[in-house]
């Protein structure tokens, strides 16, 4: 990974008149702005269809895409929707926040109209897509259609015959939900078609896409329902244990995530076939993949199913390098960012080092006066990615406002001067950009100097996350020039070559006489 810079901006945050960011002209304009600012990477959040809580890290499928991101204007141009139909919908009235309730109610009704008018079954490209993606698409489309029949209930609350995937029940729902199944396939076809076009445009402009995947799948997902053998389930396809984190300084009872845990012994027996397919699919969508909770491949925290807190959990061994050697053998060497934040042990550090993948450094974690965090720039080596913060952090400005006095003093000492709220963002961004880290990713909110209102996610909370939206006028020509200036100064983009004037030839006296 060469020395470069990039910006973190979720697709959902892109400006749009239809309530949520999409693969629309505004997304293409953002690519152009990245180029103008001298950037090389655009990092996004997971693209999967979101469920209760709207978190992209709790998706109905690890392979499918979020229908919310389908560009409605492109469907208008295709003639399967009208502008009047789209404009008549209530997607919410706050241009700075996504109203997921209204998006859900309005979007799917529009998309179903588009599907009914599309004659997609006559499109050979659709037939090709269905065939090439059958290994996940068939189960996902059936899962979503059946979920709708059960009023959105989680699959463990469905009737026993379909919950346990009895043959006659599968046949029954495939026949009786045929049009709904085809609808969900159509959505995935349009999603991939539009995303591939946007990614191609970005790549042509020299912008690489950094995707993001959680290590675990959601329990209420097509992955868990259709492939129970991959997970630590009992005979009723209920979890034996679930994922989380142990008690620490931030939580006396730990974190109970509830994701099903993998049966790593089974994955190894299959030569990690499911993981191979998962990563192969990722590299059709992204140029680089950030894997969340990378330490879980070394050791994972296992909590008995039904426990009310994470206190009863214990550490279990993960697959380690065996998984990554297998992936490299089958897929070749690919670009990965290892998210190794949080509790680190020598064995986790060894796994990251052995993998050769760049790990992460976050400056908001750095300024602890009585602690050697490892996140200060003088501790970096080149093979890492530095961030001011991630989607789980507060914005830089809001973080600064909440620092304790001793933390501020330490920050000022490290910077070599005191800085005000008006100065702190660019001072810390400069610290990140000037570091030796090969890649520097800055959340757009930090360049915009926004406060807590622009925070993407507050971990362990529900209802107020994943909502922030950018307004078009917030990205100005002046801002792009300032970003480009800093990117040039930090040697994170190609610097213009200075043309030297040719030197005049010096003629000696002897040459003159000749």
Residue ranges of predicted features:
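Acidic, mature catalytic/reactive cores of soluble proteins
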Residues: 3, 35, 160, 203-205
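Short acidic catalytic loops
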Residues: 39-46, 208-214, 284-296
